[in-house]
């Protein structure tokens, strides 16, 4: 079994209109939500073997709350700059020794991945939400369209009652 956990970056700031989209940091709510989601995942899911992360500031800041010293951490330019096909290629090239992979990324690519892998259309993939997809294969190169199932999901608003 292989597990791909998709995590959208936490809420980002739009306070500085002159800031390039790539450089936008997390806002107050994002900095509040990301560690809470991270704590929840540490209870619910095993630690990943590999984290793949967009190089955008908000994705990197979010991933920082989830990283540990034992997990391989890789920044992949394609997660921010390219579309679904290029991200699928990254996933298919993952070493099979990494059976539990977390990917920190952006919309609409994350929703498109859920639909591609499971056939399920998400109405929304909220900030800092988590969707884990499991595949009954041994190699990442063997995953195909609609070959996975959602095995876990977490939406921050479902368990975080107070917002800063």
Residues of each region from the PLM?
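Short alpha-helix plus adjacent loop in nuclease-associated cores
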Residues: 81-91
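Non-DNA-binding regulatory cores of transcription-related proteins
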Residues: 94-97, 107-128
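Functional cleft and adjacent loop/helix regions within the main domain
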Residues: 80-82, 142, 147-164
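Short, glycine/charged-enriched secondary-structure capping and boundary segments
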Residues: 19-22, 65-69, 88-90, 116-120, ...
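Generic beta-sheet signal
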Residues: 4, 96-105
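Glycine-rich phosphate-binding loop signature in dinucleotide/nucleotide-binding domains
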Residues: 44-47, 93-99
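Active-site-proximal alpha-helix that buttresses catalytic centers in soluble enzyme cores
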Residues: 2-3, 7-78, 82, 110, ...
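Domain-level recognition of soluble alpha/beta enzyme cores
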Residues: 121-153
């Amino acid at each position: 079994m292989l597990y791909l956990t998709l995590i959208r970056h936490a809420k980002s700031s739009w306070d500085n209109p002159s800031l390039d989209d790539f450089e936008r940091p997390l806002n107050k709510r994002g900095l509040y939500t990301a560690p809470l989601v991270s704590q929840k995942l540490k209870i619910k899911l095993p630690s990943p073997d590999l984290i793949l992360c967009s190089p955008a500031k908000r994705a990197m800041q979010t991933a920082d709350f989830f990283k540990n010293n034992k997990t391989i951490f890789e920044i992949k330019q394609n997660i921010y700059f390219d579309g679904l096909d290029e991200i699928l290629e990254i996933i298919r090239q993952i070493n099979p020794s990494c059976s539990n992979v977390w990917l920190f990324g952006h919309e609409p690519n994350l929703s498109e991945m859920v639909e591609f892998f499971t056939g399920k259309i998400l109405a929304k993939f909220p900030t800092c939400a988590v969707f884990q997809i499991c595949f009954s294969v041994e190699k990442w190169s063997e995953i195909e369209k609609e070959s996975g199932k959602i095995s876990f999901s977490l939406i921050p608003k479902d368990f975080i009652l107070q917002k800063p």
